[in-house]
Amino acid sequence: MRLGRDFYNRDTVTVAKELLGKVLVRNINGVTLKGKIVETEAYIGAIDKASHAYGGKRTNRTETLYADPGTVYVYIIYGMYHCLNLISEEKDVAGGVLIRGIEPLEGIEEMSKLRYKKSYEELSNYEKKNFSNGPSKLCMALGIDKGENGINTISSEEIYVEDDSLIKKDFSIVEAKRIGIDYAEEARDFLWRFYIKDNKFVSKK
């Protein structure tokens, strides 16, 4: 069942935790790709110095953070790598969840071509290990870039998230500090990174 607006229209930390175990769906090149979300990070603009919208900052880049809950926010790091976020909170309240890791479930052959430009069986163990265990890695595997920024997952067939009743939900959730935000003063110590314990597609234990 596809997640609706009410799922995202809540506290960002709650949404980040509850996205774990849900299935990210991407339709591209006539193929459906699916991955279980195994790692997330929460960002809350008003109080979070790690957020692009800290203190209510609104620019052309950050405007998507203020969009309807369930909207896709894609930004670029290091001038070349993309990161996928899902907007939370009410409209005009800047909150977002960074998707940091997914476990491939369906369409892995197409994912491999997008990620490495070769079939999955040709991949080395190192390439398989680094398939989708990081925000930019999963974007490459799913063919996500700035072109997907602003998509509404509530109605779009390109990208959305679903709750698959067949996926086990009896996992343990680890709470940890977020990654790569040492500049964010006290916010760098917030335990707003969440991941499924012992899942091999988590970017960092």
UniProtKB/Swiss-Prot annotation:
Q: Say if the entry is tagged with keyword GTP-binding.
A: no
Q: Which InterPro entries match?
A: Formyl_transferase-like_C_sf (IPR011034), MPG (IPR003180), MPG_sf (IPR036995)
Q: Which domain of life is it from?
A: Bacteria
Q: What Gene3D superfamilies does its record include?
A: Methylpurine-DNA glycosylase (MPG)
Q: What is its EC number?
A: 3.2.2.-
Got any disulfides in this one, which pairs?
none
Asked if the keyword DNA repair belongs to this entry, the reply reads yes
Could you give a single Gene Ontology term from the biological process aspect?
Answer: base-excision repair
Q: Which Pfam families match?
A: Pur_DNA_glyco (PF02245)
The record's keywords, sorted A to Z, are: DNA damage, DNA repair, Hydrolase
What Gene Ontology molecular-function terms does this entry list? alkylbase DNA N-glycosylase activity; DNA binding
Please name the NCBIfam families in this protein's record.
3mg, PRK00802.1-1
Which family does the record assign?
Belongs to the DNA glycosylase MPG family.
Report the protein name in the record. Answer: Putative 3-methyladenine DNA glycosylase
Q: Which organism is it from?
A: Clostridium perfringens (strain 13 / Type A)
Q: What is the lineage of its organism?
A: Bacteria, Bacillati, Bacillota, Clostridia, Eubacteriales
